[in-house]
Amino acid sequence: MSELLSFALFLASVLIYAWKAGRNTWWFAATLTVLGLFVVLNITLFASDYFTGDGINDAVLYTLTNSLTGAGVSKYILPGIGIVLGLAAVFGALGWILRRRRHHPHHFGYSLLALLLALGSVDASPAFRQITELVKSQSRDGDPDFAAYYKEPSKTIPDPKLNLVYIYGESLERTYFDNEAFPDLTPELGALKNEGLDFSHTQQLPGTDYTIAGMVASQCGIPLFAPFEGNASASVSSFFPQNICLGDILKNSGYQNYFVQGANLRFAGKDVFLKSHGFDHLYGSEELKSVVADPHYRNDWGFYDDTVLDEAWKKFEELSRSGQRFSLFTLTVDTHHPDGFISRTCNRKKYDFDGKPNQSFSAVSCSQENIATFINKIKASPWFKDTVIVVSSDHLAMNNTAWKYLNKQDRNNLFFVIRGDKPQQETLAVKRNTMDNGATVLDILGGDNYLGLGRSSLSGQSMSEIFLNIKEKTLAWKPDIIRLWKFPKEMKEFTIDQQKNMIAFSGSHFRLPLLLRVSDKRVEPLPESEYSAPLRFQLADFAPRDNFVWVDRCYKMAQLWAPELALSTDWCVSQGQLGGQQIVQHVDKAIWKGKTAFKDTVIDMARYKGNVDTLKIVDNDIRYKADSFIFNVAGAPEEVKQFSGISRPESWGRWSNAQLGDEVKIEYKHPLPKKFDLVITAKAYGNNASRPIPVRVGNEEQTLVLGNEVTTTTLHFDNPTDADTLVIVPPEPVSTNEGNILGHSPRKLGIGMVEIKVVEREG
């Protein structure tokens, strides 16, 4: 209803101003600004819904000041461009409409009415309400009743008798199991769901709406609210260190806790969370690649579900035979948005909806088959009678190709339990949420029936039943939950451990690189993650007087304040204010100790603007002074005009990437020497090794042969035509995820370049 009211007020404002208000520059500017704000808010809501499926939430608030990089970003570029072009077109049209009667005399009453209606349209818009609520949640002090509802359970289960298998289905919400809405989509896993305890109304709350947040909610009974963006959790050294979570209780009760997934464990700090809470045995893409049957059978995130669940079955067999009490948690990935992935072993590879194939539905149908196969193996084993199997979604599906169809249904998370010791077949429609999952499992295993804010759905009352406004209540508790991190409020001294790549201050430890905003009573960490902007772009959003400490590779800050370190890949520390003084210190000891030293200086806005502009220079446009092209730092030598076909810098150098260009091209500002030696330090990838690689300058071509290890080769060139471009053509680029950023599309690698140097020859 508020959407209709908001739009009606907007339309009325436009019509009244355009036809009645007349000519007045000030009123025109004010009305256009407010109406433009309405448009921006609603486009933001539309775009946020596209990415999150949940409107403007915490993740969006963070992303408003940080770029979205990482998983599947290339698939969102076209919609993003469309939104920008649409916004420009709407603003242009709006300005044209408002000035239709600009030659008529100004009318104060109609101008005021139009402006008030415009303000009303903004106030009534759902986007404004969502943003207002989020901003309030950032500034609240908490809710006094948090302590009454947050309950820590006993640290042990008195007499544990059952092993636990807990399966997180990536985005595998219960809505997919509606056979009337989606016929025959999930027959195998749906049949198993109907044989167990099926909890049909598990809602999603703020702070539980992405994978690591869903895991924290289900195991600790609290939303993932942190003093930093949740997916950047990989940078912390401990995760809710004071909380008692399900893994802690299991370990204290004699369980060996295992976790198996196909993606990298470091993404979003899953490894940190699990190690902090009782898990000693973790297997992700790095740990599995030496044991799986086919290490090259991978999708953008890691190993396919059939591979992961095969390894989980092997681990279940091994642990069951040992007689040791255990829990085995696993997380699938094939149903990840925006499209999902199809494992090669499933029979259900294609699902049509609305008369055409749908990739997301197909991925769901395939993945549920793989999960069902895994469960049926356990059920057929002699160890099933001693096992509890839990299947849950980590969160509701985000915007995938099935999302618009899901939104037509009553959406809930998946949570069902199959008990080998005591088969129970029942659908329980009690109102609950993800935080109740851990407490319910704990209750079944013989422990307490509460865990944090979670309550057992078998013997307790969920917060979703107690509070009709549970979403608002959860946001009200946000400051209380953030305080559970015990995060420091000041930073005076700090220590950098180069071997561990960690920084420590005031009792907290973070992985490097790291940016910190330091104020009188707050230290805000801004880690670098797959979903966040590089730290220099985050620093560019700081206010002129904000105190910062930035620990990163020296070359990243050298272009601003320490040009002598432009080629150094060591750690450096920069601190100061963007509009004031900055210092850069080279970390030259294994254990390096520093102090914060912020001076209360006069702010220079010209200096501030210059710093911000420099920080925002994209990597390929950075230039440094050097007599060769050094590939393990960003940018290129000053002599280089532009380059293409080259991937991002890594610790050793850079790969060619045929996704960015079939050839490596380096164009220099001036013609290359008439005679010169080209000294290339490089290696080849895969089938490019031991094969002739053409290297061209103008009309002359030489051949380069590389192995899988780095070598240095000198080629002799004559350049009578004054050519200014060097071209290298890898013969057979290989599509691979090796060394790739998690969630990105595969790169096509050819050669790995460490250094290229042009040496002029006499004569």
UniProtKB/Swiss-Prot annotation:
Family listed: Belongs to the OpgB family.
Coiled coil stretches, renumbered: none
Biological processes, Gene Ontology terms: glucan biosynthetic process
The keyword DNA-binding is annotated on this UniProt entry: no
GO cellular component, one term: plasma membrane
Enzyme Commission number(s): 2.7.8.20
Annotated metabolic or biological route of this protein: Glycan metabolism; osmoregulated periplasmic glucan (OPG) biosynthesis
Organism: Escherichia coli O6:H1 (strain CFT073 / ATCC 700928 / UPEC)
Keywords linked to the UniProt accession: Cell inner membrane, Cell membrane, Membrane, Transferase, Transmembrane, Transmembrane helix
This protein's name: Phosphoglycerol transferase I
PANTHER family on file: LIPOTEICHOIC ACID SYNTHASE, PHOSPHOGLYCEROL TRANSFERASE I
